[in-house]
């Protein structure tokens, strides 16, 4: 009933182990979700993710929960920006294209469930941390241009393959907008939306769906009111909800590891802000996901 548009199974397993991840998925199955998407961060991690998530599901004793999860689980494949991916962007996106084609034509039980490219985009947060002795001053216009290139290459691949894309944008709206204007592929979701209403209007005018995660519940954030304004402004037919777990657990669980089950808190919070029943918001989100990805 309460779908989670995006979580990160490899990171959940890394933090919890396989056995506990099975328990996490079992708890999530109690939501009876229509949809759940596991996102990738490298060009060819889809094979490992598919294998691990199936292993975790089949370790659940309750066969009904297994059935629910096997029906709900979908995947994206994409390349998040970091030093190596930005530097090797051309070969990695070529690898990504081959991986998508090979996976979709394989005998993997989830072969038909790879439905999006991403998350991909512009993230200036990763530039501000020290990496191999290099700090923020290392970054210059060339680095930013190359990061935009990586994003543009993946959007172009989405356009070529007619696959929706999932945008990841952190403190990089202007660069994100530049790429979208240049590539002109506007089919997909802006995930973990963290901007204000003016930026929201830009994405909506291009046709993007907007997904919110637990950060909308963080009342201590400087841009909190901007986020609430955005939550209320998004049209009914464009709103989507995610956990982005294991990150960004919603209030009142901010200090614990996030998991897909906690999407319930985000539905409840956003429903209260929009003045609609929680179950009605869930139905709306499922319809939006179904329409965007052409799901039965």
Language model feature labels by segment:
Residues 1-296:
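Mid-domain alpha/beta scaffold segments of enzyme catalytic cores
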